[in-house]
Amino acid sequence: MTNVYSLDGILVFGLLFVCTCAYFKKVPRLKTWLLSEKKGVWGVFYKAAVIGTRLHAAVAIACIVMAFYVLFIK
């Protein structure tokens, strides 16, 4: 279990948030409902989805490295 108030917890939360928003971008109903705004508070979801789709290789590698760290090292 990772604590959100530690650095590795924030990294895990950020990676999961980016991966989830990138998945939401692939689902048509969720894309129109959640990712329609590009500014403001709801724009964070859109920006995370753009990061997840444009940097999908780096995000995937970071998820694998973080999973290894959380499961075996921590």
UniProtKB/Swiss-Prot annotation:
Topology relative to the membrane, per the entry? Answer: Single-pass type I membrane protein
Topological domain spans for side Cytoplasmic: 74
As recorded in Swiss-Prot or TrEMBL, the protein's gene is named TMEM167B
Instruction: List cellular component terms (GO).
Output: Golgi membrane
Described function: Involved in the early part of the secretory pathway.
- What protein am I looking at? Protein kish-B
Q: What are the alphabetically sorted keywords of the record?
A: Golgi apparatus, Membrane, Signal, Transmembrane, Transmembrane helix
Q: Which family does it belong to?
A: Belongs to the KISH family.
Q: Where is the signal peptide?
A: 1-22
Organism from which the protein derives:
Bos taurus (Bovine)
Upper lineage is: Eukaryota, Metazoa, Chordata, Craniata, Vertebrata
Q: Which residues lie on this side of the membrane: Extracellular?
A: 23-52
Main localization of the protein described in the UniProt heading: Golgi
